[in-house]
UniProtKB/Swiss-Prot annotation:
It comes from Gallus gallus. Residues 168-179 have a biased composition (Basic and acidic residues). Zn(2+) binds at H658, H660, D671. A motif (LXXLL motif) lies at residues 776-780. The gene is MYSM1. Residues 579-711 form the MPN domain. Residues 1-33, 92-111, 167-191 are annotated as: Disordered. Its EC number is 3.4.19.-. Residues 117-168 form the SANT domain. Pfam families: JAB, Myb_DNA-binding, SWIRM. This is Histone H2A deubiquitinase MYSM1. Residues 374-472 form the SWIRM domain. The keyword Nucleus applies. Residues 1-12 have a biased composition (Acidic residues). The lineage of its organism: Eukaryota, Metazoa, Chordata, Craniata, Vertebrata.
Length: 832
């Protein structure tokens, strides 16, 4: 019978607009369908009142709902559908990706966001792998998805939700079947199945045969985890059933008022219809069991196609249930009558399974997850230092997953070191910070902290200390309540340790750095320029340290602007590659850094030779900076333009540079973090990425030459665990003449950009109190030193003279324009 009916696209993605359907001559549009077609007399509000859709519904959802109603009228009145609808269905059939299961008559639901390129049905092998992964990894869907291989994380997560719900429902149905008498009808999950006679469903068999199981699940897919639909839609089953005896609960608010088949409205945002398996020997009266699932704390509201909500008051929900009971009194003799006492029992069963409506506040209280406190250990635990227990592998799984950086040997080293430190300081409390200095190159501080927490929770360390905390609340997984006590406790430990991975809410401080929100509470900030900051640090170094007897103020443990001296490469740790820099790049970096007391920034272009292990820096491209005086970041637009300029010259981006105008060319903690991120990003393609820091006016440097540091960031962690160690390269200058015209044009651009800035350096002022050179003369000395290695002195002097004249002329024109402006202002004041 199902094969004779036209295939209906229930997704509605390509549904025709209601206006278009009407224009084709269809008289009964969805907005004017009478309730007589659908509702029993006890449900009608008015015999002649037409249905109207809520005006707040969007046009897209309105079209989908109206199309569904038009299709229902076709089934009920045997009227032909409009030509527009048939055309849209044919177009949808051409565009849609057909499921291979459609050949057997089973209707599958495709994702509304993307066509299904995979089998929506879970195979038995996938289900077995899912259950194995659940036992092995718990609720870690990423790992379970990797174990299965053929499913994504979202698919596994969606399947797991239905798996746990069905498992809970099946447990409840087994208890119900044991307590029920043999004379009652079959039940499942505490909901009695009503037998409907053929008379009540006359003319409604066709739409039921074409019914589709629709679930609104998380993220992007619908997962069918029951095998019941296969048997129901098989040809043999359909022949045995005939036309009459299927009933389903409507799946959406638009279908909810179509008949009296459902005694209860569905709850929450998702509901599932599972069809009860039919006994092959008894096909006279098949039944359908409706399972209504709740997601969290349900409220009496439902979403129409996920767009607008139809709110129902609690009293209206009860009235709806009462009307449904009244509507069932008109059943034929084939239906079983339900007495008031049985109805109360049914409501109690529904309430036990969380399927009956409650007031919103009551439902919220009932569904709140309770945090279970872990019991403190009764005695101190002694751990064998040479072995790793299975409980440890379950609690700290990251060291036993085959990672290159986190191995079981490293876990043993960290664990045994923490145990040794506890033996030394016992009975004094052993905190996490005190064990970090002895665990260099053993991973990040977070994984060390998790091992410390695990040992503390089981009583291996800090036993009997007041500071030890055992009641770390974490929702317990109720699906593991039937497992052994030891397994459950180990799983709870793993859950608590995994909860430590969640990051705290972080905000930006006044300098733009990410930090914990609590770190900013009660603080005041003083805004200093880079020069003032360097001067203040010098003064603090010169001040004698005073030992105060009273309580001294605790200094902040993290300063993003703290300068970190670079380590030198040794024979044990050799340079990964050599760095050669062209004279052009050195000249541009010097020019750029000398004209501003704020930090400047730019990109380095060149090439990397894998065979020779050499990085050649051939060009430097200045960029606009987003500077606050204390730090600078590269402007994204300017960065893109600089990358394109380097690519046009045939160079790759192999590094970046920035200036420390008046302090040492050592990277700050923030610079280290930025450089490490760049290195990680570029290393994916096998490229190298270096950082260079130029310090033109360092007060600790009496020489007129700029200080330049070329560095990379290693994987080694500092003693306090707050940063990775930077390493410094020895720079070799390439013996090639620069492109004179290009440098001259870059110089003109730099002067034009910075001469009007507030941070502009007065090039005619003395650069250092112990020197007679002006800032411009100092710049020329730096350039003279660079050019002395690549060209003869005559060419170099001629070029430097041109650079000097360019600076003088442009800065003089600036002074002249300023003088004219001041003169005009004075004259206007006198005239007024």
């Amino acid at each position: 019978m199902a094969a004779e009916e036209p295939e209906v696209d229930v997704e509605g993605d390509l549904a025709a607009a209601p206006g278009e359907a009407a224009s084709e001559g269809h008289e009964n549009t969805a907005s004017s369908l009478l309730q007589d077609h659908y509702l029993d007399s006890s449900w009608r509000t008015d015999n002649s009142l037409p249905w109207t859709l809520d005006s707040s519904i969007s046009e897209e959802n309105r079209a989908v709902i109206e199309k569904m109603l038009l299709e229902e009228e076709y089934y009920l009145s045997n009227k032909s559908l409009s030509e527009k609808i048939w055309l849209s269905q044919k177009e949808a059939e051409k565009r849609s990706v057909k499921s291979p299961h459609k050949k057997t008559g089973k209707v599958m639901v495709r994702s509304p966001t993307k066509p299904g390129s995979y089998s929506l049905k879970w195979t038995s092998e996938e289900k077995e792998l899912f259950e194995q992964g659940l036992v092995k990894y718990g609720r870690r869907w990423t790992k379970i998805a990797k174990l299965i291989g053929s499913r994504t994380v979202l698919q596994v997560k969606s399947y797991a939700r239905q798996y746990f719900k069905n498992k809970a429902k099946n447990d409840g149905s087994e208890r119900e079947e044991q307590s029920q008498h043999g004379g009652t009808l079959p039940t499942e999950d505490g909901v009695r199945v009503e037998a409907w006679s053929a008379g009540n469903l006359r003319g409604r068999a066709d739409p039921n045969l074409n019914a589709v199981k629709i679930e609104k699940l998380s993220d992007d897919e619908e997962v069918d985890i029951t095998d019941d639909m296969d048997e129901l839609f098989s040809p043999a089953f359909q022949q045995g059933v005939g036309k009459s005896e299927l009933s389903i609960i409507s799946e959406s608010p638009a279908e909810e008022t179509k008949g009296t088949e459902h005694p209860f409205p569905h709850v929450g945002h998702s509901s599932a219809v599972s069809l009860l398996k039919e006994d092959p020997q008894n096909t006279k009266q098949p039944t359908v069991d409706a399972l209504l699932f709740q997601d969290g704390a349900a409220t009496c509201s439902q979403h129409v196609n996920g767009d607008k909500s139809v709110n129902l008051e609690y009293q209206q929900c009860n009235d709806f249930i009462e009307k449904a009971e009244q509507g069932r009194t008109g059943m034929s003799h084939g239906a079983r009558q339900i007495t008031d006492q049985e109805l109360n029992e049914e409501q109690r069963d529904l309430a036990d399974n969380g399927l009956l409506f409650h007031p919103p506040c009551q439902v919220d209280e009932d569904h709140q997850e309770e945090a279970e406190a872990l019991k403190p250990p009764d005695q101190e635990v002694e751990i064998d230092r040479s072995i790793i227990l299975e409980e440890e592998k379950q609690a700290i799984p990251e060291f036993f997953e085959g990672r290159q950086a986190k191995t079981p040997e490293r876990y043993l080293k960290i664990r045994n070191y923490i145990l040794d430190q506890w033996e030394r300081c016992k009975p004094k409390y052993l905190n996490k910070t005190s064990v970090r200095p002895g665990l260099k190159n053993c991973g990040d501080v977070n994984c060390i902290g998790r091992i410390h927490t695990y040992l503390e929770l089981i009583g291996a360390i800090n036993f009997g200390c007041e500071q030890a905390v055992y009641n770390r609340p974490q929702p317990a997984d109720k699906t593991r309540s039937k497992e052994g006590k030891d397994t459950v406790e180990a799983y709870q430990l793993a859950q608590r340790l995994q909860s430590m991975r969640t990051r705290r809410r972080r905000v930006r401080d006044p300098w733009g750095n990410w930090c914990d929100a609590k770190d900013l509470e009660g603080q005041t900030f003083e805004h200093l320029s880079a020069e003032e900051l360097a001067r203040r640090r010098e003064e603090e170094k010169l001040k004698p340290s005073k030992s105060s007897k009273g309580s001294r103020q605790i200094k902040s443990s993290f300063d993003p602007f703290q300068l970190i001296p670079c380590c030198l490469f040794t024979e044990e740790k050799q340079e990964p590659f050599q760095v050669k820099v062209s004279s052009e790049a050195l000249l541009i970096m010097d020019l750029h850094s000398h004209v501003s007391m704020a930090e400047v920034i730019g990109l380095l272009g060149g090439r990397y030779s894998e065979a020779d292990k050499v990085v050649e820096v051939c060009a430097a491209e200045p960029c606009n900076s987003l500077s606050t005086g204390l730090q600078c970041e590269m402007d994204p637009v300017s960065q893109t333009q600089a990358s394109e300029t380097l690519a046009a010259r045939g160079y790759s981006v192999i590094g970046w540079y920035h200036s420390h105008p008046a302090f040492d060319p050592n990277p700050s903690i923030r610079d280290i973090d930025t450089q490490a991120k760049y290195q990680s990003y570029f290393s994916r393609g096998g490229a190298m990425f270096i950082g260079m820091i130029v310090s033109p006016y360092n007060r600790n440097n009496p020489l007129p030459y700029s200080q330049i540091t070329c560095l990379v960031i290693s994987d080694e962690i500092s003693s306090d665990g707050s940063y990775r160690l930077p390493y410094k390269f020895e720079i070799q200058q390439m013996l090639e003449e620069p492109q004179w015209e290009l440098i001259f044009e870059k110089t003109r651009w730099i002067i034009e950009k910075y001469r009007f800035c507030h941070s502009s350096v007065p090039m005619d002022k003395i650069f250092h109190r112990d020197s007679d050179l002006t800032c411009l003369q100092k710049l020329l000395e730096c350039m003279r030193k660079t050019l002395g290695k690549v060209t003869n002195c005559f060419i170099a002097e001629e070029f430097l003279t041109q650079i000097e004249n360019l600076f003088v002329s442009m800065y003089k024109s600036e002074k002249k324009s300023n003088a004219e402006e001041n003169k005009n202002e004075h004259s206007s004041e006198l005239e007024s």
